[in-house]
A protein has these predicted regions:
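Dynamic "connector" segments at or just before major functional cores
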Residues: 1-178
Length: 178
């Protein structure tokens, strides 16, 4: 037996996100993002880089796998209030933000984030596994080039280098090179 009743309170299909929001507060991600040198908006009306990163994570946690999927989360007023955003950014704002990243910015931002992460974990010995693979590409994909490809000789491919922290089951870094 259960009761059905109506209420004026707003609801969200992503109620479990409140736990993720609490986790972000407890680990201090916002403070870490402030110090890692995120690219700033080009306008004084722009969104905070921390909000854009948080919205990007929120989109992924809610099942989005494209920038456009952020629109479903953007219009959820419960999530907006939960994360303390005055307004939510359009998916194009996320695209513009991530287009500001280049190889130097990536090295700076992620170097600082990884340092913060490993300081939080307080791990003093690590096993670092390095690996590479060949990913055959079909069609005209950005960054693909002819190179070493034992399966499909002469085809375009990427040859990424990957580093894993075996003890933590964590990807330490990945370089998607042609």
């Amino acid at each position: 037996n259960f009761q059905l009743r109506f209420t004026d309170r707003e609801i969200t299909p992503w109620g479990g996100i409140s736990l993720m929001q609490r986790m972000l507060e407890q680990v201090g991600l916002e403070a870490a993002l402030r110090q890692c040198g995120l690219p700033l908006p080009g306008s004084n009306r722009g969104y905070s880089p921390i909000q854009l990163v948080t919205q990007f994570l929120l989109n992924i946690w809610c099942g989005g796998n494209r920038f456009e999927h952020a629109e479903a989360v953007r219009h959820d007023t419960v999530l907006q209030r939960l994360f303390g955003f005055a307004r939510m950014a359009n998916f194009k704002a996320l695209i513009r933000f991530f287009n500001k990243f280049n190889q130097a910015t990536n090295a700076q931002v992620f170097g600082r984030l990884y340092r913060w992460l490993f300081d939080q974990l307080q791990v003093y010995r690590l096993t670092l596994d390095l690996d590479s693979t060949v990913m055959t590409r079909y069609g005209a994909q950005a960054g693909a080039a002819k190179g070493y490809n034992p399966r499909r000789r002469g085809r375009l491919s990427h040859h990424p280098l990957m580093a894993f922290v075996a003890d933590l089951r964590l990807i330490a870094n990945c370089w998607l090179r042609p």
